[in-house]
Structures are given as C-alpha cells and as structure tokens.
Swiss-Prot record:
Similarity comment text for this entry: Belongs to the CTF/NF-I family.
Domain description: The 9aaTAD motif is a transactivation domain present in a large number of yeast and animal transcription factors.
Gene Ontology BP terms: DNA replication; positive regulation of DNA-templated transcription; regulation of transcription by RNA polymerase II
Highest taxon, organism lineage: Eukaryota
Bias type Low complexity, positions: 296-309, 420-431
Role description: Recognizes and binds the palindromic sequence 5'-TTGGCNNNNNGCCAA-3' present in viral and cellular promoters and in the origin of replication of adenovirus type 2. These proteins are individually capable of activating transcription and replication.
Species assigned in the record: Gallus gallus
Protein name: Nuclear factor 1 X-type
KW Transcription (keyword) present: yes
A GO molecular function held by the record: RNA polymerase II cis-regulatory region sequence-specific DNA binding
PROSITE patterns: CTF_NFI_1 (PS00349), CTF_NFI_2 (PS51080)
Subunit structure: Binds DNA as a homodimer.
Region annotated Disordered, chain positions: 259-319, 404-431
Upper taxonomic lineage: Eukaryota, Metazoa, Chordata, Craniata, Vertebrata
Length: 431
C-alpha cells in the first residue's frame, strides 16, 4: 500500500518529500508518451497513428496517482544525485518559495557540461538535466532534442551548468507567435483584443478555398485547453482535492505539510522508554560521498533505516530495524553534558513540516504515512553532518539506556551528582 506521497522506507528523504508536491502530473504522461512512441517506431518502423497515440495518452492520464508519485519520487532521487551538494538546499528552498531563485549547478559530465539522465526504467533515451527540470516543475512539453530552445535568465551567473527551473526560459520565434494566435483563437473562441481586424472583417474565401490557418496540422494529440490544464496539475493532487493548503501554513523550514493532515499520527513528547532515533537512509541511491543530510523544518527526521537498491529496482517495504552503536553510561554522561540546552529535548515544540505554497488542494487517505517507532528528536533547522552526531546520539539513547539499565544498577550506589545539579533542579526533572 502506498502512502499519500508514495514515500516508502527506501524512498523517503526530506529532499523528495519537499519537492514532490511541486512536480507536475503532466511530466509523467509526457515522458512515458515519448518513450511509447519511440518503442512503437522501433518495433513497427512507422510512427503511431493519431488514434493510437491518443489511446496511449488517455491511458497514461488515467494512471493511478500512487504510480505517478512513485515515479516522481524516484526521479527526484536521481535529480538530487546530479545536483551539487552545496546547491541542494537552495534548490529546495527556491522551488518551495522560501527563498529567491539562485543558481543551482549540475554536476558536470566528462565534457564539463550539464549531465543527462534517464527518466524511466530501462529507458532508451537520456534527457538533459535542465530540460527535465522545466518539464517537471513547469509542465512545458519539451522534447529531448529541444535543448537549444532553452534560454537562461540574465541574472543566471552560471548558464553553462545552471539547472534552476526559475532561471530557464524557452525561446520563441516569430513563427511560434504567429501560430499561437491561430491555434488558440479557435480553441478559446476569442481572439486577441489588440488585433485591429475583427472577426466580422474576416470573410471566407470563395470557390471552396481554405484559409492558410485551416491548413495547419498538429503533430500531437493535445489541444490548448487540455494541455494547459494538465500541465498545471501537481502530481500530488491526483487523488482529488478536499482541502486547501492555505490551512497548512506554518513557519520555518522548507516543509509546510502537517503530519496530522497527511494521516501521520502526531509525534508526542518523549515517554519513559525514551526516544529512539532511526538509522539514517542508506545513501546508495540518495546520497553521494560527503553530502549533507538536511532535516529542515522543526524536528524532521528520516524514516526508519532500510537498504536502498538500484533506482529502477523493486521497493522493499519490509519492517525497519533500529540499531544502537553502543552503550552509554547515564550518570557519567550527565556530568559532562547536562548543562547543554540540547538535553532538555522534552521541551521542544512538536515537529511540524513547513513550506509548500498554497497553490492547490490535496486529498489523501487517512492511513499512516510511515511506520513510527517512537517520537523523533525535535529541533528547528538542524544540519546533521556525518561523524558529528555524538551529542545527538547521546540525547537519543540516554533515557532508553537509563531506563533499561535501572534495575541492573540498583545493586551499586550511583555516583554523586555535580554541584551544578540537584534533585530539586527543574532541569533534571526532564529525565
């Protein structure tokens, strides 16, 4: 069973969950439609007919929302690997509207140019990363050969490697403008008000001759209204609107989706058994060497640990296991770190995800998004770096170890507390 955002244990990552609501559902249909057309041509050595292409389009548009979201989450994982680590957080913040757009650089290929990626399983075509960005986040129907039609904004400082979708535009020629009028006017029933020649002045040609615009032949199976409507629909809203994202606004971070609204049970304060921090994701598919893992927003942590296979492989949804790196002595640790403000983790506010623009409405099932083993450590906007989690690990496991080893330590007297702490000190009441 898929979660509303299709973030299974192997696919969950803050980067993916933050960007998924901003992916256009049109991108799934477009990438798959292009692949079907290429496959058909290789097999039959002829192009699809309009009827066949329209049938494939309708089939893809009617695909289950979980399938589209699962595809989008895997593609976002690939995008993350091909973006420079120092640009990933800026990319998320700019796409979610928390920060002004800035350059987001692609990892260069062997020639120093923008990388190309495959967007489907067993794909026979690779797409330039900037093309993928524009299709994913703007819903522009570009082909894989349209790279030279892209133009970078004047404020873009690195046009050779920048893949920021807000820095990328599409060049329009005079022919495009001319055709746009004749294609849009019959579809909408209205013409440009600036046109000095009204509809009454356009007279039909005699002797059955067709006007020039009547000879236009579209190569695709989309009309203007349908294309615009589908390209503006987020992939996360395919299950049907029921409430507005405007009700979910909350400050901080680059999330803005309440765990309660998503069907996830609220994270309560630490219990007597103590919180357990799940092992971080195996970064085989989501992490590169030396990458930072961002848990932005008040108290966001990764899902329970699991092994990440190849991006095109099947998803393993087996229950996660928690591991402890070692034993911690409760009393001796208190003497060294009790004065740290991080120790009073029970007083932090409950985790709330923050940051998706209220552009559309979402409706999700009420089931739990991810299996929860216990409340997470809550602290606003923390960056966890590899090899620097000693104090955090102590905070996560000190209560659990203290409670579990309490009966064993009852046979020997505990060492006296430091002078800075006493039984009446309210700071020690947390433990």
């Amino acid at each position: 069973m898929y979660s509303p955002y299709c973030l299974t244990q192997d696919e969950f990552h803050p980067f993916i969950e933050a960007l998924l609501p901003h992916v256009r559902a049109f991108s799934y249909t477009w990438f798959n439609l292009q692949a079907r057309k290429r496959k058909y041509f290789k097999k039959h050595e002829k192009r699809m007919s309009k009827e066949e292409e329209r049938a494939v389009k309708d089939e893809l548009l009617g695909e289950k929302p979980e399938v589209k979201q699962k595809w989008a989450s895997r593609l976002l994982a690939k995008l993350r690997k091909d973006i420079r680590p120092e640009c990933r957080e800026d990319f998320v913040l700019s796409v979610t509207g928390k920060k002004a757009p800035c350059c987001v650089l692609s990892n260069p290929d062997q020639k120093g140019k923008i990388r190309r990626i495959d967007c489907l399983r067993q794909a026979d075509k690779v797409w330039r990363l900037d093309l993928v960005m524009v299709i994913l986040f703007k819903g522009v129907p570009l082909e894989s050969t349209d790279g030279e039609r892209l133009a970078k904004a004047p404020q873009c400082a690195s046009p050779g490697l920048c893949v920021q979708p807000h820095h990328i535009g599409v060049t329009i020629k005079e022919l495009d403008l001319y055709l746009a009028f004749f294609v849009q006017a019959p579809d909408s029933g209205q013409s440009d008000s600036s046109n000095p020649q009204g509809d009454a002045d356009i007279k039909p040609l005699p002797n059955g001759h067709l006007s020039f615009q009547d000879c236009f032949v579209t190569s695709g199976v989309w009309n203007v209204t349908e294309l615009v409507r589908v390209s503006q629909t987020p992939v996360a809203t395919a299950s049907g609107p029921n409430f507005s994202l405007a009700d979910l606004e909350s400050p901080g971070g680059y999330y803005n989706i309440s765990p309660v609204t998503l069907g996830r049970r609220p994270l309560g304060p630490p219990t007597a058994s103590g919180p357990k921090r799940p092992k971080a994701l195996d970064e085989g598919d989501l992490e590169g060497p030396g990458d930072d893992v961002f848990y932005s927003g008040p108290g966001r942590s990764p899902a329970p640990g699991s092994s990440q296979g190849p991006w095109g492989g099947d998803v393993d949804t087996s229950p996660a296991t928690l591991k402890k790196s070692g034993k911690l002595d409760f009393c001796s640790a208190l003497s060294g770190h009790a004065a740290s403000p991080r120790m009073a983790f029970g007083h932090h506010p409950l985790p709330v995800l923050a940051g998706v623009r209220p552009a559309s409405a979402l409706h999700f099932p009420s089931g739990s998004l991810l299996p929860q083993s216990g409340p997470y450590f809550a602290h606003p906007t923390i960056r966890y770096h590899h090899g620097q989690d000693s104090l955090k690990d102590f905070v996560q496991f000190v209560c659990a170890d203290g409670a579990a080893q309490g009966p064993q330590h009852s046979q020997r007297p505990a060492p006296p507390l430091p002078p800075a702490l006493s039984a009446s000190d309210p700071a020690t009441a947390t433990f």
